Amino acid sequence: MRTLAILAAILLVALQAQAEPLQARADEVAAAPEQIAADIPEVVVSLAWDESLAPKHPGSRKNMDCYCRIPACIAGERRYGTCIYQGRLWAFCC
């Protein structure tokens, strides 16, 4: 019986020793999103839209998928303007 009590005490001490670093790590992880957000620079995307090239019917824009592409639009897409991203000019294709 005494051996069982000693083994239980050793087990509890070992578990407590592991729990303290886990709690400290959990505190670090909780603070990490604020730190990560401060490290990420802002991304600015600028779009230049040519209204004369826009579809004339309001319903035709409903399901339109548009992308910024380099160097040009792919087959089946039409260039509607220019995107400026990270200092580079991209084609605004729909």
UniProtKB/Swiss-Prot annotation:
PROSITE patterns assigned to the protein according to its UniProt record, in alphabetical order: DEFENSIN
Gene Ontology CC: azurophil granule lumen; extracellular exosome; extracellular region; extracellular space; Golgi lumen
Major site of localization recorded for this protein: secreted
Single biological process term from Gene Ontology: defense response to Gram-negative bacterium
Residues that make up the propeptide removed upon maturation: 20-38
InterPro entries registered for this protein in UniProt: Alpha-defensin, Alpha-defensin_C, Alpha-defensin_N, Beta/alpha-defensin_C
Domain of life, per lineage: Eukaryota
Disulphide-bonded residues: 66-94, 68-83, 73-93
Signal peptide stretch: 1-19
Annotated Pfam families: Defensin_1 (PF00323), Defensin_propep (PF00879)
Keywords carried by this UniProt record: Antibiotic, Antimicrobial, Antiviral defense, Defensin, Disulfide bond, Fungicide, Secreted, Signal
Subcellular location: Secreted
Biological function: Effector molecule of the innate immune system that acts via antibiotic-like properties against a broad array of infectious agents including bacteria, fungi, and viruses. Possesses the ability to neutralize bacterial toxins such as B.anthracis lethal factor, Clostridium difficile cytotoxin B as well as leukocidin produced by Staphylococcus aureus. Also blocks herpes simplex virus infection by interacting with envelope glycoprotein B and thus preventing its binding to heparan sulfate, the receptor for attachment.
Family from the record: Belongs to the alpha-defensin family.
Protein name: Neutrophil defensin 3
Lineage: Eukaryota, Metazoa, Chordata, Craniata, Vertebrata
